[in-house]
């Protein structure tokens, strides 16, 4: 384990919406340091959402998607006397956001649409409407925690 807790670096809000969560999303979306490509994909997806939705704002859909995918509970492995138990634990807010972003990007990449902009736009729309693969991942995580509620007293 490390001696000191690593300092949390502040991210700058993005230039268009002034939103730190969008900056974190772009940073997670980025491959090989190509931030301009990731930025184009993100803003392109938000514009595509506005085209599809009509009167809805892309940023509102994005915020709804993040909120809907944030997990409340997850399971952590804990060894007790030779047996490994899946112990349900509450998820800290910072980790909730990080997992939501990670799941949205992962499942957007697995979609079958033609471009990444379309994939991301459709995954965000699905997540905002409480469907899609990333929302299912959150539900599965919660079900796993509920199923192992009996081991909750092993929390640390």
From Swiss-Prot:
Q: Does the keyword tRNA-binding apply?
A: yes
What Gene3D superfamilies does UniProt report for this protein, alphabetically?
Ribosomal protein S7 domain
Domain of life, per lineage = Bacteria
Assembly and partners are described as: Part of the 30S ribosomal subunit. Contacts proteins S9 and S11.
Q: Which PROSITE patterns match?
A: RIBOSOMAL_S7 (PS00052)
Q: Protein name, please? A: Small ribosomal subunit protein uS7
* Species of origin: Campylobacter curvus (strain 525.92)
Concerning PANTHER family, the annotation shows:
RIBOSOMAL PROTEIN S7 (PTHR11205)
Q: Does the keyword Amino-acid biosynthesis apply?
A: no
Q: Which UniProt keywords apply?
A: Ribonucleoprotein, Ribosomal protein, RNA-binding, rRNA-binding, tRNA-binding
Regarding protein family, the annotation reads: Belongs to the universal ribosomal protein uS7 family.
Q: Name one GO biological process term.
A: translation
**Recorded GO terms, molecular function?**
rRNA binding; structural constituent of ribosome; tRNA binding
Q: Which CDD domains match?
A: uS7_Bacteria
Q: Give the function comment from the record.
A: One of the primary rRNA binding proteins, it binds directly to 16S rRNA where it nucleates assembly of the head domain of the 30S subunit. Is located at the subunit interface close to the decoding center, probably blocks exit of the E-site tRNA.
InterPro entries, sorted = Ribosomal_uS7 (IPR000235), Ribosomal_uS7_bac/org-type (IPR005717), Ribosomal_uS7_CS (IPR020606), Ribosomal_uS7_dom (IPR023798), Ribosomal_uS7_dom_sf (IPR036823)
Q: Where are the transmembrane segments?
A: none
Matches recorded under Pfam families: Ribosomal_S7
Q: Which cellular component appears as one GO term in the record? A: small ribosomal subunit
């Amino acid at each position: 384990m490390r001696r000191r807790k690593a300092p949390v670096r502040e991210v700058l809000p993005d230039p268009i919406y002034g939103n730190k969560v969008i900056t974190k999303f772009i940073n997670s979306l980025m491959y090989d340091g190509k931030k301009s490509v990731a930025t184009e994909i993100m803003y392109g997806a938000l514009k595509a959402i506005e085209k599809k939705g009509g009167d809805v704002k892309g940023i509102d859909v994005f915020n709804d998607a993040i909120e809907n995918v944030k997990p409340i509970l997850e399971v952590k492995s804990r060894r007790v006397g030779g047996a490994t138990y899946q112990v349900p634990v509450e998820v800290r807010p910072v980790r909730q956001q990080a997992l939501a972003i990670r799941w949205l990007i992962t499942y957007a990449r697995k979609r079958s649409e033609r471009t990444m902009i379309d994939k991301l736009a459709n995954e965000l729309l699905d997540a905002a409407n409480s469907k899609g693969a990333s929302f299912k991942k959150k539900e599965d995580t919660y079900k796993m925690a509920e199923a192992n509620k009996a081991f909750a007293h092993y929390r640390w």
